[in-house]
Amino acid sequence: MKKYAFTLLLLLGTSACTQVTPPPVVERPPAKIAFALGGGAARGFAHIGVIKALEAQGITADIVVGTSAGSVVGALYAAGLNGFQIQELSMNMNEDQILDGSGMYQCVVETVVSNKRGCIKGQALQDFINRNVHGLPMEKLGKTFAAVATNLRTGEMVVFRSGNTGMAVRASSSVPVFFEPVTISGQEYVDGGLVAPVPASVARSLGADFVIAVDISDRPQDKSTAGITDIMWQTFSIFGQTINRHEQSSADIVIRPVTYGLPSTDVSGSNKAVLEGEKAVAAILPELKARLAKLNETRHVAGMP
């Protein structure tokens, strides 16, 4: 009996001394957030309001991808300017600084009458961007940045990630008829909105864990067609609907500022566009915060790198 008691005591002692070490809890790096900023000409000022409102909530991007007007704002943001600084810059900007001195209506008339490839070279826009990013190439900006353009010969999407920042933005923003195509390394490029109106899939391909897309495009039924420029933008809107739906399926959340009624070709409505961007973030903020919180929870997984 004593023998069995002694054996039991040894077993209990061994059990008490043996500790099961739980698997280590390894925290993954913070989720990479991307802003996918869509095209929309002068309505692109709404991107500034979106960025301002997100920054106020502590939400910033690691990756920025822009199409057309989105590439303009995106380049400035990736270079380190915050939303307020970009807005201040936009308030002191006039059309001549980015349109080579041509008004939009005059531009279209000149192009059609003279059969030109575009009445705006885009050099002023290129210089404006390079001046405000301090001449840094894309790969040297503070955040990962990409600008989306369309190869005019093949119709394929091209994603610029390195090289002259202003030139890439110029290519991404070269709306046909208004801007001349941009030649880079022997290839001609036009507005990226033809292939990726809201470049969410590109943001995802660059390693984003969470993509916040900003859609500033007009719905066709919301557009006036009172003149030739209106008809052109209406055509772009119709053309981009299907592509836009496909692109937005790659986003985790889509912010849609109310931009219908805002002119596509007049920068004078910039303050209203900024305000609409801020309002759009406020409307979707509860859902956005909930999704980000859920994403962060899943990154604290026991025993996983």
Task: List the model feature ranges, each with a label.
Residues 17-64, 76-305:
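Patatin-like phospholipase
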Residues 5-15:
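Bacterial N-terminal signal peptides
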Residues 66, 70:
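Gly/Ala-rich beta-loop-alpha elbow adjacent to hydrolase catalytic centers
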